[in-house]
Regions:
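Sec-dependent N-terminal signal peptides
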Residues: 4-13
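Glycine/tyrosine- and acidic-biased, solvent-exposed loop/turn segments at the edges of beta-strands
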Residues: 14-112
Length: 112
């Protein structure tokens, strides 16, 4: 019984460290450019804020990144990097589409 309690305590305390995935987490990007170093702490005034799926401590799956100057990225992430989605400026104009981790289609037009 004592061993079972020790094992359960270990799993509960260290499960975020040993690489499981979570939906709806918040991370903050540290660094000046993509790809960021992702941390669970930050200030939305100085660090880009990510909300979405997280695996192994980095964005992986669907999520939203909001930069400190107002642009936003909505879409999928792969191993902490932007993968397939759309980047908008602070006014809601589409500025880039991302396809398999590369910026594409820099047509500027208003989204509705």
């Amino acid at each position: 019984m004592k061993l079972l309690l020790i094992i359960l305590s270990f799993l509960l305390l260290y499960s975020p460290v040993i690489g499981n995935s979570h939906k709806g987490e918040t991370l903050y990007g540290w660094g000046n450019t993509l790809p960021y170093v992702w941390k669970g702490v930050g200030d939305k005034e100085t660090h880009p804020k990510y909300e979405g799926d997280v695996e192994n401590g980095v964005p992986n799956g669907l999520g939203v990144l909001i930069s400190t100057n107002g642009w936003k990225y909505f879409g999928s992430w792969k191993n902490g990097e932007i993968w397939n989605g759309t980047e908008y400026d602070k006014d809601g104009n589409i500025i880039y589409r991302w396809v398999e981790g590369k910026r594409k289609y820099s047509n500027l037009y208003k989204s509705y």
